[in-house]
Amino acid sequence: MAVCVAVIAKENYPLYIRSIPTENELKFHYMVHTSLDVVDEKISAMGKALVDQRELYLGLLYPTEDYKVYGYVTNSKVKFVMVVDSSNTALRDNEIRSMFRKLHNSYTDVMCNPFYNPGDRIQSRAFDGMVTSMMIQVC
């Protein structure tokens, strides 16, 4: 099950972080923050090839004993990070990709909102509801 979903701006500050359960929120914030180094490393390793790709899924960034951290980057260099419970072995790579595509589509809807200023924290109820349903659906 996805236990944390984060949207990170191009300048590496959080636009949105949602975690379940909330008692481990600081732990998940730390995991998301440390994964940004791996994201930057993968992006720089891809170099120009990243621009030509339509699929911006970075895959597994790093596993821990209890969790796996996955990444995705948009064309505008906004990063999506998802922390998944390692005990859920039924969750496949293509399901993670699908979750990131849903997240990207919902993020695009937020960006198209004329009342949203790019770079501000995401406070959209529709976006939050989509993330919550995505986290519950995977359970």
UniProtKB/Swiss-Prot annotation:
Keywords: Cytoplasm, Endoplasmic reticulum, ER-Golgi transport, Golgi apparatus, Transport
Assembly and binders: Component of the multisubunit TRAPP (transport protein particle) complex, which includes at least TRAPPC2, TRAPPC2L, TRAPPC3, TRAPPC3L, TRAPPC4, TRAPPC5, TRAPPC8, TRAPPC9, TRAPPC10, TRAPPC11 and TRAPPC12. Interacts with the heterodimer TRAPPC3-TRAPPC6A.
Domain of life of the native organism: Eukaryota
Matches recorded under PANTHER family: TRAFFICKING PROTEIN PARTICLE COMPLEX SUBUNIT 2
Protein name: Trafficking protein particle complex subunit 2-like protein
Compartments in which it is found: Cytoplasm, Perinuclear region; Endoplasmic reticulum; Golgi apparatus
Family assignment from sequence similarity: Belongs to the TRAPP small subunits family. Sedlin subfamily.
Annotated function: May play a role in vesicular transport from endoplasmic reticulum to Golgi.
One annotated GO biological process: endoplasmic reticulum to Golgi vesicle-mediated transport
Predominant place of localization: cytoplasm
Pfam families: Sedlin_N (PF04628)
Organism for this UniProt entry: Bos taurus
